[in-house]
Amino acid sequence: MQRFKLEDVELTDPKVVEPPGTLFTGRIGRQKVLIPGSSTNFVMNIIHFDVGVRNKFHIHSTDQILIVTDGQGYVVNESETIQVSQGDIIFIPEGEVHWHGAQEDSPFAHISLQAAGCKTSQIEE
């Protein structure tokens, strides 16, 4: 058994600008809660989005759960836009085309939980 406190999870990838053609539209930071190999079943990260930054439309090969930890953001699929804030939990089924990110006037952060081995395929350029 392990206990994690959000404030104790190391920022493993400082806020960087992702190169053109990658999944994010701007600067993000990543904290790896479960480092690769520590769980045979799950991958868990905390993703921090700068103001207005989002990821592009994409799909996952497994279900995804997002737990909003800070700021204001959106989770969007092909037919719905959900405005989210701290404490909201979003379930995204395997194969659903979607994006998530910060509102235009707020940074945003969420925990992302997926099955180990999950593949992400970017749909939007």
Located regions from the model:
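Short acidic-glycine-tyrosine-enriched beta hairpin
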Residues: S79-G95
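A short, N-terminal "cap"/entry segment at the start of jelly-roll beta-barrel domains
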Residues: M1-N41, Q122-E125
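Glycine- and acidic-residue-biased ligand/ion/polar-headgroup-sensing regions
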Residues: T62-G73, E78
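Short beta-strand His + acidic residue motifs that chelate non-heme Fe in jelly-roll/DSBH
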Residues: N55-F57, V75-V76, I92, V97-E104
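Conserved short histidine dyad/triad with adjacent acidic residue
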Residues: K32, N45-H60, E94
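A short hydrophobic beta-strand segment most commonly corresponding to one strand
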Residues: I47, F91, D105-I123
